Amino acid sequence: MEKLVDIIKNGEKKNIIVLSGAGVSVAAGIPDFRSPSIGLYASLKSMKHLKMRSPTFVFDIDTFVEDPRPFWWIFGRLWPRADWPRPTIFHYFLTLLEKHGILLRCYTQNIDDLESVAGLPHDKLINCHGILSPCHCLDCGEEVSLSYCINAIQPNIKSNIDDYEKAVVPNCPFCNKNHVKPDVTFFGEYLPKAYRKNHKKDFAKCDLLIVCGTSMKVDPVCDLPKLLEPEVPCILINREKVKEKGNKAKQFFDQVKTKFSIGFADYTGIFDFDNKDSFIGGDLQDNCLEIIKRLGWEEEFEELKKQTETIDHPLAKLISDEANE
């Protein structure tokens, strides 16, 4: 932590990239994917009717084309039933980096858009895995409002259906087919245009990478650090170390695991914690707050929270506006 604070205080780095994953939003009440007790995949694995299927099938484009019910079923289970989630300390720390003029970009694997609620400008954010709104029909290509889809799947939301085979799906209002999908990136799809346009030049320009709340197991985002210049340091703020470089025996073992892994995992090491890279372990939010304090940004942090208290979540506002049209 001291290394990161010193780097920021000394003004050494002006083009910081933050790469974030589901772990940064757990404190906002949004489940991550792989935590043993609260992760979304753990919850899916516990459901007997999935019959040993990998939880990732819910977010696979081939599965969606074959049967969109699994996705809209889990979508209904995750959709907020009361208050919308609010930004975490991490999200405010991200905005503070931008306000101090040292954030080049945030590359997030999340689709919750809490960065916007915390005041991060749109041009500083790359949603690697897309966004929830709008939706599009895969059959006719027409744009469909998210509020239309939410209205259509109310039984999934209200009745807490425990079997995806009983889930309802939105039919396209233009062609009446059932392949209406939010603009999120499924496994097997290309990443968004903004990602493809910016990632190579951004990482070539980056002088410090901060990685937060991610297992670094989903391609191609997990390989982004490989685009950095060799001397660029990385700071991993996570509960545990991931993708750590090791000795030759460990590297060989990781490569073997990668070759025979089922799905999308890449186990090969990226972070060199024995040399240029650093690891900050423990609770992510506690660590972000401590970094803010050590930087002397506490007053700015409190003021930023006050300024954003009245900002509605973009999706909440969108649904409300569309419902009133």
Report residues per predicted region:
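Conserved catalytic core of sirtuin-type NAD+-dependent deacylases
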Residues: M1-E325
